[in-house]
């Protein structure tokens, strides 16, 4: 029976749903609240706290089709990808899980029923393994299922290894939950080399593991003793690629429908026809991990997860280049991938444009140095006397041309060489943080604290309450008392303090008793407990004490305004920019809010203004902010926005603001949108390819921001006015100097009329103030005389006349200037010794000035 990969996925989930399992969406490839993991690499990752007893959900049975990535860190399949039949950077793990519900018998029966009844696999093709001492599992397979004893293989501990070091014994760590597992293998037939598990030929490809059932039934202590768990659990996993290969009658995973579609698409994009080439397999595999990592918010960078993504992209580009790709090709595979992934590709389709742009930009950037880097690498290999390429060359390729070391190793291996990894690491020195596991993926200090408390949160309706101290921790160790000055984590039986979640920061405040005061500086989740981080400011505190838990109300109120505004902002962005906008992160504090979202380009000033207008419009409408608890499917049916990759319980809290915004949210919010008062965007910018960030303020913070902006504006205006005044003064000084210089030249134009000094002249471009200064200067130089100056500036006529005091009884300056003004379309007057006028007819000025001599002569 042939089944497509999507049909296998749907059949698996439907089968276990019929067995009472909750279908849980695949979690993000970026593990939530687990700093020990680079990427989600197994179906059980999102249920880790459930298995540890730190988290309780509304269901005890679950089933998933989990997206996984193994590339970098401990689980690194990168160098084998494309060269074997079953290694991938990205894969899907089908799984069914029991959290203290059913155990071995049901798990085994379910697996067998699905394989033989639903998928109709031939029973004779299946064999199973159990841990050597797990008689219970052996008997279930043999007596309940009916598998002959010779097809049930007991697998013991590895030779030379520790006890329980076996392929059929699972353990989370040196201590903690662990237990035996049973694996189901499929026999591809004797035409393929290989032996059954446990045989010398087990590494062959004839018998392929398709399903692993892990039975968590013990808690291992540090001394090695095994204590039975009170509620044993089940964790199973079946790789969809392997089972799809069987259902499609092929042996290699790369022959299934998903990969064949991608291989053909890659061949078309590159212009290469041989579909069996291993480089096409590499490209087909890598587009899956790259695309879904970007969907889950990872962007190419030089550190942490972003650097792993960059390495995978560049490895794919190099293999495309090897096949003769001209120009960018990798991003062209996103569309075919979204289609062939079926029900698992819905979110990829929504973000297709973003994923394509990120890949294209990264590919183009690397393409600028790829050819040069390959030339240097090939030259170095050509000149190599031994078999190992030195670390300095590997580092140069990394540092200068962006070649990850594993890419260089790929090329070297293809030519029969290896690289000096130790030398490369030495050359890296301080830059080594860019490598596989960035420093942030280190010790999970919270794992040192195992809280048995399930804290009840009562902060939606109250900001203070009575609580009992259940547990206290100092530096990871549980203590029973605290003294003044101790920095500690306190767990209460119930609390009004909100623990950081969903981008909203944790509450602060105090825990008070008659004997002590504990300042809460932060609040975080600790499994099902809520951890109050802070310091005992005074007195003492002991486990069992009753405390007054008091939240800083003013700070919380400011946070709630910003959180509610974030929801309005999200909705407004989708209305203004489009439905492709998806939240990629947020930080809600008392002072500001920060919102990261998917968008391909910078927002225009008009778009920012429109988003602000929409948000403030909804603020003024003063919607009641309503919360309702409902089933998640019902919430989605009502149009509630859920954050992709976020983990939700079956019952969710739906927050609505009129008909403008409906989202799933567990945070603290205002009562009405009007409480926000005012919303103001203070910045918008890019933080990664296709990811934008808005920072904004609300309420008093917005008013403070606007006041500060106004103060800055006023200060700038005052500063500019002072500068303008200074410039005006400097300009006038320059004009005065220029006038003085011109007046010195005019003195040579003085003529005698009836024995009196007379100066008549036309200037251009001077202002009246300069003309007056010029006349005063000329009068001083002449001692006795009559001066008439005309000036044309910006098409208008300016006139000024000056008469020394000894001549004003004969010629008056006011009469003189008025006579000239009448000829140029104006009039004027003034004192006998100084007068000015204006006119509009600049063309008449020369003839008007020519009439001055005769007019003066008549009066002398």
Curated annotation (Swiss-Prot):
Keywords: Aminoacyl-tRNA synthetase, ATP-binding, Cytoplasm, Ligase, Metal-binding, Nucleotide-binding, Protein biosynthesis, RNA-binding, tRNA-binding, Zinc
Cofactor binding comment, as recorded: Binds 1 zinc ion per subunit.
Disulfide linkage: none
Main location: cytoplasm
Highest taxon above the source species: Bacteria
Binding site for Zn(2+): 563, 567, 665, 669
A biological-process GO annotation: negative regulation of DNA-templated transcription
Database matches in InterPro entries: aa-tRNA-synth_II/BPL/LPL, Ala-tRNA-lgiase_IIc, Ala-tRNA-ligase_IIc_anticod-bd, Ala-tRNA-synth_IIc_core, Ala-tRNA-synth_IIc_N, Ala-tRNA_ligase, Ala_tRNA_ligase_euk/bac, DHHA1_dom
Reaction catalysed by this enzyme: tRNA(Ala) + L-alanine + ATP = L-alanyl-tRNA(Ala) + AMP + diphosphate
UniProt xrefs under Pfam families: DHHA1, tRNA-synt_2c, tRNA_SAD
Top EC group: ligase
Gene Ontology cellular-component terms listed: cytosol
Cell compartment(s), UniProt: Cytoplasm
Keyword Protein biosynthesis among UniProt keywords: yes
PANTHER family in UniProt: ALANINE--TRNA LIGASE, CYTOPLASMIC, ALANYL-TRNA SYNTHETASE
Cited HAMAP family: Ala_tRNA_synth_B
Family: Belongs to the class-II aminoacyl-tRNA synthetase family.
Entry note about domains: Consists of three domains; the N-terminal catalytic domain, the editing domain and the C-terminal C-Ala domain. The editing domain removes incorrectly charged amino acids, while the C-Ala domain, along with tRNA(Ala), serves as a bridge to cooperatively bring together the editing and aminoacylation centers thus stimulating deacylation of misacylated tRNAs.
Role according to the record: Catalyzes the attachment of alanine to tRNA(Ala) in a two-step reaction: alanine is first activated by ATP to form Ala-AMP and then transferred to the acceptor end of tRNA(Ala). Also edits incorrectly charged Ser-tRNA(Ala) and Gly-tRNA(Ala) via its editing domain.
Protein name stated in the entry: Alanine--tRNA ligase
């Amino acid at each position: 029976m042939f089944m497509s990969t999507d049909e296998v996925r749907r059949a698996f989930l439907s089968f276990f749903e019929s067995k009472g399992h909750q279908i849980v969406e695949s979690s993000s490839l970026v593990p939530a609240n687990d700093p020990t993991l680079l990427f989600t690499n197994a179906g059980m990752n999102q249920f880790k706290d459930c298995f540890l007893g730190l988290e309780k959900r509304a269901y005890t049975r679950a089933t998933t089709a989990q997206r996984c990535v193994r590339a970098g860190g401990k689980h690194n399949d990168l160098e084998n990808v494309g060269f074997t039949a079953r290694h991938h950077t990205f894969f899907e793990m089908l799984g069914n899980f029991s959290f203290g519900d059913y155990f071995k018998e049901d798990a085994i029966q379910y697996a067998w029923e699905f394989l033989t009844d639903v998928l109709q696999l031939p029973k004779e093709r299946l064999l199973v393994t159990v841990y050597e001492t797990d008689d219970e599992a052996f008997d279930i397979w043999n007596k309940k299922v009916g598998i002959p004893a010779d097809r049930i293989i007991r697998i013991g501990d590895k030779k030379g290894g520790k006890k329980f070091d076996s392929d059929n014994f699972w353990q989370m760590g040196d201590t903690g939950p662990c237990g035996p597992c049973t694996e189901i293998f499929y026999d591809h037939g004797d035409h393929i080399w290989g032996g059954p598990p446990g045989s010398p030929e087990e590494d062959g490809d004839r018998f392929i593991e398709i399903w692993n059932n892990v039975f968590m039934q013990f808690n291992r202590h540090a001394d090695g003793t095994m204590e039975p768990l009170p509620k044993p659990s089940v964790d199973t996993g079946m790789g969809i690629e392997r089972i799809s290969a069987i259902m499609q009658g092929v042996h290699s995973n790369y022959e299934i429908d998903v990969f064949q579609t991608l291989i053909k698409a890659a061949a078309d994009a590159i212009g290469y026809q041989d579909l069996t080439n291993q480089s096409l397999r590499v490209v087909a595999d890598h587009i899956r991990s790259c695309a879904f990592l970007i969907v889950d918010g990872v962007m190419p960078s030089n550190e942490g997860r972003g650097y792993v993504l960059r390495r995978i992209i560049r490895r794919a580009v190099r293999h495309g280049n090897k096949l003769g790709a001209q120009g960018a090709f990798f991003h062209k595979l996103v569309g075919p991938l979204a289609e062939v992934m079926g029900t698992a590709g819905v979110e990829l389709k929504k973000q297709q444009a973003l994923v394509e742009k990120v890949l294209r930009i990264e590919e183009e950037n690397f393409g600028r140095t790829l050819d040069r880097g390959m030339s240097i690498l090939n030259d170095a290999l050509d000149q190599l006397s031994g078999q190992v390429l030195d670390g300095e060359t590997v580092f140069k390729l990394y540092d200068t041309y962006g070649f990850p070391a594993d890419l260089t190793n790929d090329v070297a291996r293809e030519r029969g060489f290896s690289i000096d990894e130790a030398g490369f690491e030495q050359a890296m020195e301080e830059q080594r943080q860019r490598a596989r596991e960035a420093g942030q993926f280190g010790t999970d200090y919270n794992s040192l604290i195992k809280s048995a408390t399930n804290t009840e949160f009562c902060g939606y309706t109250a900001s203070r309450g009575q609580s009992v101290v259940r547990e206290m921790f100092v530096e990871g160790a549980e203590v029973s008392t605290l003294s003044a000055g101790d920095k500690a984590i306190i767990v209460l039986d119930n609390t009004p303090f909100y623990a950081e979640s969903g981008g909203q920061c944790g509450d602060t405040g105090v825990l008070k008793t008659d004997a002590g005061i504990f300042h809460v500086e932060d609040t975080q989740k600790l499994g099902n407990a809520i951890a109050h981080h802070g310091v005992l400011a005074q007195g003492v505190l002991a486990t069992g004490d009753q405390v007054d838990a008091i939240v800083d109300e003013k700070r919380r109120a400011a946070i709630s305004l910003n959180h509610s505004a974030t929801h309005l902002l999200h909705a407004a962005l989708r209305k203004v920019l489009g439905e492709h906008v998806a939240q990629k992160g947020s930080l809600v504090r008392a002072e500001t809010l920060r919102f990261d979202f998917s968008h391909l380009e910078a927002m225009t000033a008009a778009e920012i203004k429109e988003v602000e207008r929409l948000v403030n419009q909804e603020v003024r409408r003063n919607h009641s902010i309503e919360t309702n608890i409902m089933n998640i499917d019902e919430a989605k049916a009502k149009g509630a926005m859920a954050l992709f990759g976020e983990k939700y319980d079956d019952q969710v809290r739906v927050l609505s603001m009129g008909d403008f915004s409906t989202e799933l949210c567990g945070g603290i919010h205002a009562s009405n949108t009007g409480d926000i008062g005012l919303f103001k965007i203070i910045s918008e910018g890019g933080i990664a390819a296709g990811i934008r960030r808005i920072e904004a303020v609300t309420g008093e913070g917005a008013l403070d921001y606007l006041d500060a902006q106004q103060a800055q504006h006023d200060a700038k205006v005052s500063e500019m006015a002072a500068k303008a005044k200074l410039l005006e003064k400097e300009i006038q000084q320059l004009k005065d100097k220029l006038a003085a210089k011109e007046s010195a030249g005019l003195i040579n134009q003085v003529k005698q009329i009836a024995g009196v000094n007379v100066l008549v002249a036309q200037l251009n471009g001077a202002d009246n103030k300069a003309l007056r200064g010029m006349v005063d200067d000329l009068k001083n130089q002449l001692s006795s005389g009559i001066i008439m100056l005309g000036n044309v500036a910006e098409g208008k006529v300016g006139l000024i006349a000056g008469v020394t005091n000894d001549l004003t009884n004969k010629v008056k300056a006011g009469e003189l200037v008025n006579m000239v003004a009448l000829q140029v379309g104006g009039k004027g007057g003034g004192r006998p010794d100084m007068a000015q006028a204006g006119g509009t007819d600049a063309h008449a000025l020369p003839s008007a000035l020519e009439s001055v001599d005769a007019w003066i002569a008549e009066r002398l």
